[in-house]
Amino acid sequence: MPATTGSVRRPKTTGLAKGDPAPGVAKVDPIVVIDDVTRRFGGLTAVDVDHLEIPRHAITALIGPNGAGKTTLFNLLCGFDKPNSGTWSFDGTQLSGIPSFKVARMGQVRTFQLTKALSLLTVLENMKLGATKQKGESLLRSIFPFIWRAQDDEIEEKAKELLVRFKLDAKADDYAASLSGGQRKLLEMARALMSDPTLVMLDEPMAGVNPALTQSLLDHILDLKDLGMTVLFVEHDMHMVRHIADWVVVMAEGRVVAEGPPDTVMNEQAVIDAYLGAHQDVDLGVVTGRVRGELDTAALTLLDDIKADEAEAIAAAEEENQ
């Protein structure tokens, strides 16, 4: 299904995988490769990814229920967090142990679910912060404007061009604090482009956005691919994912349970189970005895599973207390 934005239909990218859609399937041209990455918080395993490849020059959606490990995986890939084990690479370069600012300089940038605009700077000043290798960042050089003035003018011109593209040019001299939630999302995306990235990672770009700006954000995400970038984004809106994503990766309980083209993945039982629960057709009130009713085969199977789990937990507790 082509991606639809307004009256314009954009073709989906196909032929991304070397084999049939399945967790860990090899891609024709991967830009990110993840191997045996785990992240634990105490006794909770937040991420446990055996193998995952993100296709280049495509829009990949990372979906899953709350607590699936999506944002944690994002943080690991960007260097904002450290894994307990595993390795991953970006564009052929190993990123394990590389700090986030160096990852960004390599061309992998991200936005956040909660926007990170500096409220007491203007919109234009926020944009200029996104540019890399600024000569004026050196304390000594900052004293001598003739060293950095020409570059600063170029950066400001680029920032203004992006603000026009994202329809924020009228806000250039306003403080970022005055922007709406949707406008802040646009500012974050525009600022990310100041570093000329290869991979743009968006963490729930539609969260908290006014419906009036949703279409604008969708258009800009599709524009990123048209400009030759790779997009990886976290999202809960299944309808939106189906329409703009070329490839979908589904996580549940820290693991990748499915991946493939949107229309294929949305019909997989693993995806339905992840979002609705493996026993979505079973009345749990009947199973637990709180509601009168007849136990069918599915309910009896679930009841047996519950009893087995209880017995296992009791046995483990008794063994620990011995």
Regions found by a protein language model. Name each.
Residues P2-E310, I314-N321:
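Glycine-rich phosphate-binding loops of nucleotide-dependent enzymes
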